[in-house]
Amino acid sequence: MSNTPVELKYTESHEWVRTEADGTLTIGITDLAQEQLGDIVFLELPDTGRQVKQGEAIAVVESVKAASDIYAPVSGEVIASNADATESPESVNEDAYDAWLFKIKPANADDVNALLSADQYQAKAGA
């Protein structure tokens, strides 16, 4: 069974979301997603300063099996992308919850509350 930390929020499209002390959100892909993708070989992450809408495809993860879009879990502004993950995409396979992909300053902080809990994500994902 995949690792699904209870302190995070999740999307049905397999992104995890961590709310930081300053209200910004750190986003990555779930352990289940990296397992299904297999060896990740390339990441295309959004530019800092980009305005994104909830549900918009804003990044790409490529593995030896497939390329998958990563979606914005909330609307807001991209305030950081993880250059370390871009340089070492395999880090996402090694620890999906440490190798974050990008950070968003949400337009509406309450949007996070509509995301899935760990239990809800596991139920929907069949994890």
Swiss-Prot record:
List all disulphide bridges recorded for this chain. Answer: none
Tell me, what does this protein do in biology? Answer: The glycine cleavage system catalyzes the degradation of glycine. The H protein shuttles the methylamine group of glycine from the P protein to the T protein.
Lipoyl-binding domain: residues covered? 24-105
Subunit note: The glycine cleavage system is composed of four proteins: P, T, L and H.
Quote the cofactor binding remark: Binds 1 lipoyl cofactor covalently.
Which CDD domains does the entry link to?
GCS_H
The identity of this protein, by name, is: Glycine cleavage system H protein
One GO CC annotation, please? cytosol
What NCBIfam families does the record point to?
gcvH, PRK01202.1
HAMAP family assigned: GcvH
Query: Which is an annotated Pfam family here?
Result: GCV_H
PANTHER family from the xrefs?
GLYCINE CLEAVAGE SYSTEM H PROTEIN, GLYCINE CLEAVAGE SYSTEM H PROTEIN-RELATED
The keyword Translocase belongs to this UniProt entry's keyword annotation: no
Keyword terms: Lipoyl
Residue positions where N6-lipoyllysine is found in the record = 65
Cofactor dependence: (R)-lipoate
**A biological process term (GO) from this entry:** glycine decarboxylation via glycine cleavage system
Family designation: Belongs to the GcvH family.
